[in-house]
Amino acid sequence: MSQNGDKDHELIQGKVKSKTEIEDSVILDQDTLQGKGEEKTKLDELIRWEAEKNDLLKLIDNVGNDEVFTTVETCQRMLDDLFPQDHEVWSNPDLKWLNPCDKNGVFFREIALRLDKGLAKVIPDEYERKKHIMTKMLFSIDLTKFTSLMVRRTLYYCIKANKRKTSEDEGCAIANGAWFNNECGNVVKPYKEHYFDKQGKNKKCKFCRTDEKFKYQQSSSNEKYAYDFIHLNPNEYESYFKTNFGVMKFDVIIGNPPYQLANNRGGDAGDGNGANPIFQEFILRALELQPKYLAMIVPARWINSSEKVFLKFRAKLQKSNGFKGINIFFDSKHCFPNRQIKGGVCYFNWQNGYEGQTLITTKSSKKGKQEEIETYKRDFFAPVLNNTEQVIFRKKFDTTFIKR
């Protein structure tokens, strides 16, 4: 996060305007967001530094408690660790990439840069190569209407993917809007709703378990936080992906899903304060699509937590195994400098059909001092003992260190 421009920094952090106020004002003013003439818009307040010398994705750290934005540095490190430069994903033009929980476009921006380099010999023409990457390889499902604007701005340089240059307005999308025939491009604006059971006093969404009376259903909010990817019935997959992308099969699924839905007691993203964890639902949904690779950055507490939701989650994961590598950071600030996430965070590379040992890398800190990184291989899931649950890291696991 840049330290320049306190006013803008406070605005972006939501100290001057709340998350809801920023999101709602941007969404309601979409028709004027192009900034014609001298007109100033709400989105301009968030992005005006981008045209100068600053990186928008380094400026915006977080717009709310429910979604933790991935920093550019963390995204780059995650890609370096899970998919090294010589990995096949960077030189295969036929792969389809899906981010089912996009927030700011950081993953696909960094991925596009690497694909542009890796596909140089396969598609020598620079224009055709970039067009192929953007139109045939990268597909995004956004979390909110607000984040869909950010993602398109990041990937296409404009909130309308088919925006062309006009005499009245100098702004235009990538390739002068010629690569797409619609405003969204390959970035889906969410449109699903929560599904509440009609029976019982405390009605909860059957997909994410949020309460019908909670803030996500307030009439004053333009966002319902009914994340499309986990609010789809299995029989909707084909029509959803075919309608929005014209693609049915995804080879690489990657992202940083929302960690949980905040609660009325002030639960924050990842703090475990009684809120409903939902990141595991994104992982399970992704596995249902049977990609070749799955990579996500999520809270690490699922690994050995005794919470019922994570016991069930691990039981389902054991059926697929496939964990080729996992990096665990017991201090979440290694990945998110401005966030404290209970139990740390981890990112992993799941590979379809992989049955070998898992390369485990751990990093811990003590009293603010970074300790050495520890790397080793072992079976990710321990053998079943006396018909009890298979567990990961059967010896002591805490938020500081793993003892083997």
From Swiss-Prot:
Gene3D superfamilies: Vaccinia Virus protein VP39 (3.40.50.150). Pfam families: Eco57I. Coiled coil: none annotated. It comes from the Bacteria. The keyword Translocase does not apply. GO terms for biological process: DNA modification; methylation. It catalyses: a 2'-deoxyadenosine in DNA + S-adenosyl-L-methionine = an N(6)-methyl-2'-deoxyadenosine in DNA + S-adenosyl-L-homocysteine + H(+). Its EC number is 2.1.1.72. This is Uncharacterized adenine-specific methylase MPN_108. It comes from Mycoplasma pneumoniae (strain ATCC 29342 / M129 / Subtype 1) (Mycoplasmoides pneumoniae).
